[in-house]
Every structure is written in structure tokens, then in C-alpha cells.
């Protein structure tokens, strides 16, 4: 899980999800998991 000020989709499997006001990227590739904060 990477914590970044700006989250971007890395590949076409990445999905942007907003959970409790936190923007997250989920993907089948674990390295691509990110959250904003």
C-alpha cells in the first residue's frame, strides 16, 4: 500500500474507489495499491 498525495491508475486493472472520503486504488497487482492522504 502506497500513501500518496496524488493517486493515479498505473494499469488498466486499477480501479478508483472512494471509501469514507479516502480515495483508493485497488488492483489485481498488489504493488499498485494506493491511498490518498
From Swiss-Prot:
User: Which keywords does this chain's UniProt record carry?
Assistant: Ribonucleoprotein, Ribosomal protein
GO BP annotation list: translation
Decide whether keyword Amino-acid biosynthesis is in the record. Answer: no
List the GO cellular component terms: cytoplasm; ribonucleoprotein complex; ribosome
Source organism, top-level taxon: Bacteria
InterPro entries referenced in this protein's UniProt entry, alphabetically: Ribosomal_bL36, Ribosomal_bL36_sp
Q: Which GO terms describe its molecular function?
A: structural constituent of ribosome
Question: Sorted alphabetically, which SUPFAM superfamilies does this protein's record hold?
Answer: Ribosomal protein L36 (SSF57840)
Query: Pfam families attached here?
Result: Ribosomal_L36
Which family is this protein grouped under?
Answer: Belongs to the bacterial ribosomal protein bL36 family.
Name under which the protein is recorded: Large ribosomal subunit protein bL36
Q: Which organism is it from?
A: Photobacterium profundum (strain SS9)
Amino acid at each position: 500500500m502506497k500513501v500518496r498525495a496524488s493517486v493515479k491508475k498505473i494499469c488498466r486493472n486499477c480501479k478508483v474507489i472512494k471509501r469514507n472520503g479516502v480515495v483508493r486504488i485497488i488492483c489485481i497487482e498488489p504493488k499498485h495499491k494506493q491511498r490518498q492522504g
